[in-house]
Regions:
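N-terminal catalytic cores of secreted or lumenal carbohydrate-active enzymes
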Residues: 12-198, 202, 210-217
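Solvent-exposed loop/turn segments at secondary-structure junctions
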Residues: 33-36, 72-76, 123-128, 153-159, ...
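Conserved, mostly hydrophobic/aromatic
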Residues: 67, 120, 150, 155, ...
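Noncatalytic carbohydrate-binding groove/subsite architecture in carbohydrate-active enzymes
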Residues: 120, 129, 135-136, 170-299, ...
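Aromatic/acidic polysaccharide-binding cleft in carbohydrate-active enzymes
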Residues: 275, 279-375
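Carbohydrate-binding surface patches
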Residues: 359-405, 411-420, 468-471
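Acidic, Ser/Thr/Pro-rich beta/coil linker or hinge segments at domain junctions
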Residues: 394, 402-466
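Short Pro-Gly-centered flexible turn/kink motifs
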Residues: 463-475
Length: 476
């Protein structure tokens, strides 16, 4: 089978082919690659609307998505074993994150009630190792087998910036951070017994590799430290305008330039590489960018390009409630990016491998997923030409080599009538396969609409994808 996009002179389209009669040649991905992250003080518990939103993805994949409990406040939070409260803090404005807080055992009990895997972020910045060890032991006891990893410190490259964290009072650098990570990973890992089952998530920086990256950390780790490390993580917030985020070439370049070499270094160690915290724009997002349909398509494309690059899981950060423009739910009841994440989840669900069919340098993208036997499972076609209003252009994608005897293939369209700037909170809800997700509940609404795409006797079909749209094609 081949997937080719018709456009005269567009060299980026000419290599978008794969053999529909062979095995999948893409990267093996995590069964639940898309996860959610929440700043520690504001994590929601089971039974909330957030769990309904996550349950929609569980229904696609068969497993609860991974979550990370961490963020800026993890290096401001100390464990209080005597506290009966989930968390204790005060702020002058509910849109602020607290500068200090404590949390008790009930907070970790709550984390253990989630049905999927959990990454727990603990404090390193305050330099109170014994307190962090106590919290880690409680996390192991409460979360149990679902505790995927513990990370010690959030974005530690910023420890020497005002207000300077106690651990960095005498200076800070990649070398000093590496020495600190190694010391703490050994101490915490041995205290909780993870020398028999590695639990540490190393790295967790936001500044760019290689200065702050896994490759430079790995060369400073000995075998004992490496034995404690389960995963290596980095953060990423591309930022920019809606038009910039929507660009497929821009998204591909961002992932490739920042992470390709760092991912390769980690994979050589036989460990997973994680985007432990990411979203469109840092600091909670931008009101005129992060809730839009353009950001939804970026979310979809970004996930798939990351998985193609070898990144196992992508945790989309949900920050302070009331000041979270990029939240998939909560800030705007339903943010448009949830639709993009849902489309990416549907594309990857139950797949064994996936690959990109384009070189990432043009406006048009094609991805293929394969089942466990290597047979083609789905195609995702994306037209990143910018559309906001007026006449909407379209791009035909030609599919060749489809199985003989198929009269048609089914497809779901991800679209918004108002284009890149559409926002559900302004009455411009996107649709995925004709379906919307209800404000405040995430309950799917509307029929599940499949388009029928005719297949010729020669095994060829043409799918028209409008500007600022994507189409998911089902091959089985």
């Amino acid at each position: 089978m081949s997937a080719r996009k018709r456009r005269n002179g567009d060299a980026h389209c000419l290599g978008c082919t794969f053999d529909g009669h062979g095995r999948g040649r893409g990267n093996i991905h995590d069964p639940e690659p898309i996860g959610g992250g929440r700043i520690q003080v504001l994590t929601r518990g089971p039974g909330t609307r957030g769990n309904i939103c996550l349950a929609n993805w569980r229904d696609l994949t068969g497993a609860w998505p991974p979550i990370r409990i961490g963020g800026t406040t993890q290096d401001r939070a100390l464990y209080d074993a005597a506290s009966s409260a989930y968390v204790t803090y005060s702020v002058a404005d509910p849109r602020d994150a607290p500068m200090s807080l404590t949390y008790g055992p009930r907070f970790l009990t709550l984390a253990g009630q989630y049905g999927g895997s959990v990454v727990v972020g603990l404090n390193r910045g305050r330099n109170q190792l014994s307190n962090t060890i106590e919290a880690a032991k409680r996390a192991v006891a409460e979360v149990g087998d679902r505790l995927l990893a513990i990370e010690l410190g959030n974005e530690p490259e910023y420890y020497d910036r005002a207000p300077v964290q106690p651990i960095a009072q005498n200076g800070w650098s990649p070398d000093l951070d590496a020495a600190s990570q190694n010391e703490w990973h050994l101490a915490v890992g041995r205290a909780i017994g993870s020398d028999k089952m590695p639990l540490m998530q190393a790295g967790n920086w936001n500044d760019s590799p290689p200065k702050w990256g896994a490759a430079q950390l790995i060369v400073k780790q000995n075998a004992s430290v490496k034995a404690q490390v389960r995963t290596y993580a980095h953060h990423n917030y591309p930022g920019g305008s809606v038009r910039g985020l929507l660009s497929h070439a821009g998204t591909s370049a961002n992932v490739r330039s920042r992470f390709e070499a760092d991912v390769a270094a980690v994979l050589r160690e036989g460990k997973p590489y994680i985007l432990g915290e990411t979203n469109s724009v840092s600091g909670g997002g931008a009101a005129d960018v992060s809730p839009t349909f353009g950001a939804a398509l970026w979310t979809m494309d970004y996930v798939l390009r990351a998985v193609y690059t070898g990144i196992s899981r992508i945790y989309f950060h949900h920050g302070t409630v009331g000041n979270c423009q990029y939240c998939f739910w909560g800030r705007y009841s339903m943010g448009a990016p949830y639709y993009g994440a849902t489309a990416a989840t549907a594309f990857l669900a139950q797949a064994g491998t996936m690959t990109a069919l384009d070189d990432g340098n043009g406006a048009y993208a094609a991805y293929a997923s394969f089942d466990a036997s290597g047979a083609p499972l789905r195609l995702l076609l994306f037209n990143s030409d910018y559309y906001e209003s007026g006449s909407r252009s379209a791009q035909p994608f030609v599919l060749r080599g489809l199985p003989a005897g198929n009269a048609a293939v089914r497809a779901k369209r991800l679209t918004a009538a108002a284009g890149a700037l559409a926002r559900q909170d302004r009455g411009q809800a996107p649709t995925f396969g004709g379906r919307t997700f209800a404000d405040g509940t995430c309950v799917p609404a509307g029929g599940d609409v499949f388009e029928e795409v005719p297949v010729s006797a020669a095994g060829e079909a043409t799918v028209s994808v409008g500007a600022t749209e994507a189409v998911l094609v089902y091959l089985q």
